[in-house]
Amino acid sequence: MVEKIWFDNHPLKYLLWPLLWPLSLLFGAISKSKRQQYQSGKKQAYKAPVPVVVVGNITAGGNGKTPVVVWLVEQLQQLGYKPGVVSRGYGAKAPQYPLVLDDNTPAKHCGDEPKLIYRRTAAPVAVDPVRANAVKALLETSVDIIITDDGLQHYALERDIEFVIVDGNRRFGNESLIPLGPLREGVERLSEVDFIITNGGQAQYGEMPMSLTPSKAINLKTKQQVEVSELRDLVAFAGIGHPPRFFNTLNAMNADVKVTKGFADHQDFDRQELQALAQQGANVIMTEKDAVKCDSYAQDNWWYLPVSAQFESNDAERILNRIKEVKATYGSPSA
């Protein structure tokens, strides 16, 4: 219901407006005050000895940040850099912080997105609610550039480059701050960032278009790859910021979807619930982010659909050139 108020102009917003509007004003005042404390020097932000690139958004929910992080890591690795990724580890609880991921780290300890990034890129990944501590842990692994998955509003960590990812279809909803609207910060914040990436829809002036391109479906147990259109009688589920985006992708691929089920973002799945859901079709398909949470009990007919960020070549070049420029201003981490 909240998202209908934020994005669909639901009539209920007029009833809730007297309650939510003052709370939005309070949220905005607190957020602005926190940022000003770091800008004025009243609070000291941590400055890393290597470049820090933030990939975030100004709206609540998922807009496609993680595929952009994966793309950046892969591009930088190809250029010979040693990128590392930090995250808050939202929705997870680690035995201790900071937590540097390894092959055996479960998603419940690190979070689904950090686990996905680690698996896709093999780059060092650390999680900590205090991102500066995660950065310090990664510096011990000899990384030479840090990418933070989310954290645009985490001003306790200085950054060199800021990306904002925008849902090109839903944009900024009613353009109100939380809880009246979806905004973490006002849209004026966009004028201060380095790159505005628009995921789907129509990119506006000054924005870079980005698309999420799906590949073949991958079996959770055997790693076999098949075309999605070859899988019959699919049960599709997604625990992401906006599940309909995943279902729309499947429809565009002519997938034989019989049942869809959306879950909350970062939801800790109930094994019995998923297994019961799976009984409604011949095959199950999910997002890659969901797969890292349930691969330990996956069945032979469970599949996930990886997606990759795609940019126009000139935009990709602009992004990488900007990072190279910033990187050139830093010495080596050991200097």
Curated annotation (Swiss-Prot):
<keyword id="KW-0808">Transferase</keyword>
<keyword id="KW-0443">Lipid metabolism</keyword>
<protein>
    <recommendedName>
        <fullName>Tetraacyldisaccharide 4'-kinase</fullName>
        <ecNumber>2.7.1.130</ecNumber>
    </recommendedName>
</protein>
<keyword id="KW-0418">Kinase</keyword>
<dbReference type="GO" id="GO:0005524">
    <property type="term" value="F:ATP binding"/>
</dbReference>
<feature type="binding site">
    <location>
        <begin position="59"/>
        <end position="66"/>
    </location>
    <ligand>
        <name>ATP</name>
    </ligand>
</feature>
<dbReference type="GO" id="GO:0009029">
    <property type="term" value="F:tetraacyldisaccharide 4'-kinase activity"/>
</dbReference>
<comment type="pathway">
    <text>Glycolipid biosynthesis; lipid IV(A) biosynthesis; lipid IV(A) from (3R)-3-hydroxytetradecanoyl-[acyl-carrier-protein] and UDP-N-acetyl-alpha-D-glucosamine: step 6/6.</text>
</comment>
<keyword id="KW-0067">ATP-binding</keyword>
<dbReference type="GO" id="GO:0009244">
    <property type="term" value="P:lipopolysaccharide core region biosynthetic process"/>
</dbReference>
<comment type="similarity">
    <text>Belongs to the LpxK family.</text>
</comment>
<dbReference type="InterPro" id="IPR027417">
    <property type="entry name" value="P-loop_NTPase"/>
</dbReference>
<dbReference type="GO" id="GO:0005886">
    <property type="term" value="C:plasma membrane"/>
</dbReference>
<keyword id="KW-0441">Lipid A biosynthesis</keyword>
<keyword id="KW-0444">Lipid biosynthesis</keyword>
<comment type="function">
    <text>Transfers the gamma-phosphate of ATP to the 4'-position of a tetraacyldisaccharide 1-phosphate intermediate (termed DS-1-P) to form tetraacyldisaccharide 1,4'-bis-phosphate (lipid IVA).</text>
</comment>
<dbReference type="Pfam" id="PF02606">
    <property type="entry name" value="LpxK"/>
</dbReference>
<dbReference type="InterPro" id="IPR003758">
    <property type="entry name" value="LpxK"/>
</dbReference>
<keyword id="KW-0547">Nucleotide-binding</keyword>
<dbReference type="GO" id="GO:0009245">
    <property type="term" value="P:lipid A biosynthetic process"/>
</dbReference>
